[in-house]
Amino acid sequence: MTPLVLFRRLAIAEATTWALLLTGMVLKYGTRTTELGVQVFGMVHGVVFIAYCLATVFVAVNQRWSARVTLLGLVSAVPPFMTVWFDRWAERRDLLEGGWRLASGGEAPRSVPEKVQAWMLARPVAAAAVALLAVAALTTVALLVGPPASSSS
């Protein structure tokens, strides 16, 4: 899986969960028929949002994105559907080209983030476990902090 494929899949997943959450919000606040859509898709969207943000940082390290581009990629997860726009914008500028430069036989890592990435690329099963644990831990923190907006209605 290339940086482009990883990033695109999560950008599309993030936009899709936005659509599902917005549908749930219409059902809850517009038609007042059910809160189930917000309860289910809110959680799903939160998990995918976190995964997208982690993947953005992971790809940014590999692609040597500037802080500005990385921040734009992260902020694109906030407005609905902007992750897909950012994905296309980054691809048009060749910001998602190539493979994993720090994979075995590739460049030697120089910074701490690059060393972490090289370790993860050399151990994909362990990396997947670390990624899942990171998403779970950040989701737990988000649940403890509470929803981004008041849930009273």
Locations of the language-model features?
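Juxtamembrane boundary at the C-terminal end of a transmembrane helix
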Residues: 137-153
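Hydrophobic, aromatic-rich membrane-embedded alpha-helical segments
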Residues: 71-89
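Membrane-cytosol interface at the C-terminal ends of transmembrane alpha helices
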Residues: 48-61, 83-91
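Core segments of transmembrane alpha-helices
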Residues: 11-21, 49-52, 128-135
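Loop-to-helix transition at the N-terminal end of transmembrane alpha-helices
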Residues: 34-49, 153
